[in-house]
């Protein structure tokens, strides 16, 4: 068994861990060990590097932990997918590359929690900007020199994108030019983590590429963290497995857990930090009975509302194997063409009720009818909207099954456990149908494929959701920040009741954000990195941002085609 010593040990080279490894080693006298259970982000592997190939990593286990939930009691007892990234880049290596920061009011709401006063939107915005290089240039809301390449959709990519945005506006919802700028609410182009050369902009590419040659950073892949070591109440190191070999590394300063919303609570529990009764049931010595570890688990659930396309403008031909070599060759040689896009180039956020303070529904528009993981492709030209609610009141948990680090934990999101969940999904389906029936889509819109035009009553819509809704792959909040009885970490990611131990990833969100989670996770890591380094936080900015303040969610009077009566 080998033993070495570092200032910091980071468990997990994902969206947060790579940020910390890069920022901490900017100080040349600081040594960092970065442990990653997966392998390298092989740059020759089109499955992770080609944006259009985003479904492929979810279909195997080289890059995907392929977790599965326990039977979900409100979803026909289905065991549902819970894909998580494995390899340098973590989930930024296999995600959909949608760059969505969340709504300003998400962070303002966090800041109302005791101890989180410095997590307002205006406190967080400088760190979003620090991380970003946006292809159309910086402004008050966007960065121009950060590690993460962000590409903004341009007009003319596919007529369906513009038609779907126009349809949203014709239905009475706002148009927004920037879902990450002044106003998230509305429909518009979607930013994506794609490089100017058409490659996936994972945090391995953006952050580790600039840091991996530093002599004070050691990156160890295929290293599965087994447990955190403690000297009394202080984290002192980590034991990890590389194949059949066990190694131990000691931390002079801190152990930083960045393993994600599933594996971070799993590692803490395996190390003796978590609900005492759970640990004792597995004969794990209790270092600290911390009841919130693994609780408060949240996710986004979504549906695919699919339509036949009457004109041959969808991506359907690109799904055929005989067309894919040409697409792949153009992407490989030039970084252009269909392979260079994730094809989530338009979307939006709406409120379904006037009393919703900020958007509760997200849309991703896609010019093909297919499941996110590449399954169940409709054999015809089609298009779809991915539609889901943003802040479900339902809460789940991550619970250790055994002491074996190779065993997956018990995961229960408890999807659709509350009455509000059902109301929001019914509202979302009906709102989507109103959008899809607007004149902008008349030339393209054929019959409704899913749920199908005959699916109308509350009971029928609920049955569709139970049978067909899927995860958006946004697990979070299972080691939440705060100071209540179920909080796990403080506002700087430090685990309550212990020294030398932090959690820094999407698990520390107190409440899930409105949209995709990669951008907020990077921001969280950038912000806490300054705290770890003892640096003065970036100054709070002063820019305006949209607040509805009770304004109508939809201007029905301006809708080109009025709502149907059911």
Curated annotation (Swiss-Prot):
Query: Which EC class does it fall in?
Result: oxidoreductase
Positions of the UniProt region annotated as Disordered: 180-201
A GO molecular-function descriptor = choline dehydrogenase activity
InterPro entries from the entry?
BetA (IPR011533), FAD/NAD-bd_sf (IPR036188), GMC_OxRdtase (IPR012132), GMC_OxRdtase_N (IPR000172), GMC_OxRtase_C (IPR007867)
- Pathway listed for it? Amine and polyamine biosynthesis; betaine biosynthesis via choline pathway; betaine aldehyde from choline (cytochrome c reductase route): step 1/1
Q: Name one Pfam family in it.
A: GMC_oxred_C
Q: Which cellular components does GO assign to this protein?
A: membrane
Keywords in UniProt for this one?
Answer: FAD, Flavoprotein, NAD, Oxidoreductase
Q: List, from the UniProt record, the residues annotated as the active site of this protein.
A: 474 (proton acceptor)
The UniProt catalytic activity note for this protein reads: choline + A = betaine aldehyde + AH2; betaine aldehyde + NAD(+) + H2O = glycine betaine + NADH + 2 H(+)
Give cofactor(s), names only: FAD
Is Ribosomal protein among the key words of this record?
A: no
Q: What is its EC number?
A: 1.1.99.1, 1.2.1.8
Binding of FAD: at which residues? 7-36
Q: Which GO terms describe its biological process?
A: glycine betaine biosynthetic process from choline
Protein family (similarity comment): Belongs to the GMC oxidoreductase family.
Record function comment? Involved in the biosynthesis of the osmoprotectant glycine betaine. Catalyzes the oxidation of choline to betaine aldehyde and betaine aldehyde to glycine betaine at the same rate.
Among HAMAP family, the record links this protein to:
Choline_dehydrogen
Question: What name does the UniProt record give this protein?
Answer: Oxygen-dependent choline dehydrogenase
